[in-house]
Amino acid sequence: MKEPFGFLNLIKPPGMTSHDLVDEARKVFGIKRIGHGGTLDPGASGVLPLAVGRATKLFEYLQESVKLYRGEITFGISTTSHDAQGDILEKKEASWITKEKIEEIIPLFIGEVQQIPPQVSAIHFKGKRSYEWTRKGVKVDLEPRNVRIENIVIKKFMEGEFPKVILDVKSSPGMYMRALARDLGEKLETGAFLSFLVRLESGPFKIEDAYTLEEVKEKALQEELGAVLLKGDRVLSHIPKISISEQQKTLLFRANRLPLDTEPGKNLIQLYDEEEELIALGTIKGEKRPYYFQPVKIFD
């Protein structure tokens, strides 16, 4: 039986870890070679892309994918983890905060900004994850990291003793919404935490196209798992593709290169066979004709 090969756009529910979902997917597909792209905190929900089978080799070409989050931030309360999973550190009445005051400070957090990751995070520090030090009661001084926040949009503001705001945030990978909530609270001198989080998009993966774990299991019962997997050209649409014949495919696998009448360059190219299966990634090389395709990844 041919190993499944593709990407699964899965919805992570709150309460499960990202690795929990990978374990469940391994049981459903019956293979171990499954990985996820972009960890979501246990309390968060939303899009969690999974690479199935040989598609795990492709994650490195998705790492710069822009993320879109929708998060609720509660002002006046600080927690140890900057989200609802942590212990409360301080409560401070913050009814004076208005939508206008939040609008005033939002521009400070757009563009290339420095952000200190949360103590409770998977960042490596002296051989361990930061959260492992935190569990031992050791405070670590994590270095600020450069992140890019492309846009922040206020979707809703709710007044009260501890006012809340719902924000849509588009950012580069590596940006922590929990840290953004913390920093907004510090700027307003009230403290704040991330009360809930949904990831709406991760690169080409969008929540409106995503499957729940239950839906995937149902497809497995119906022997229709192939229907939930996205092929490479859907996910790697930013990389040009070329289709080749079965004869050319055989030659590529035998010689580890393939003559192609395409101008050379540094940009990657996808090669697809007659069944529209991704078989290789590589570049066109050569100083004169005949130019040739040199693979950097082969999926045989």
What is each residue range found by the language model?
Residues 53-56, 78:
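Short, charged/polar surface micro-motifs in flexible loops or helix N-caps
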Residues 121, 125-144:
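Extended alpha-helical targeting/anchoring segments
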Residues 50:
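Phosphate-centric recognition/catalysis
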Residues 1-13, 17-36, 40, 44-47, ...:
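Accessory RNA 3′-end/elbow-binding domains used by RNA modification enzymes
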Residues 150-158, 283-285:
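Short amphipathic beta-strand and strand-loop transition segments with alternating hydrophobic
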Residues 60-75, 140-154:
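Structural signature of FAD isoalloxazine-binding scaffolds in flavoprotein oxidoreductases
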Residues 122, 164-207:
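Pseudouridine synthase
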Residues 61-114:
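Acidic, low-complexity central loop/insert segments
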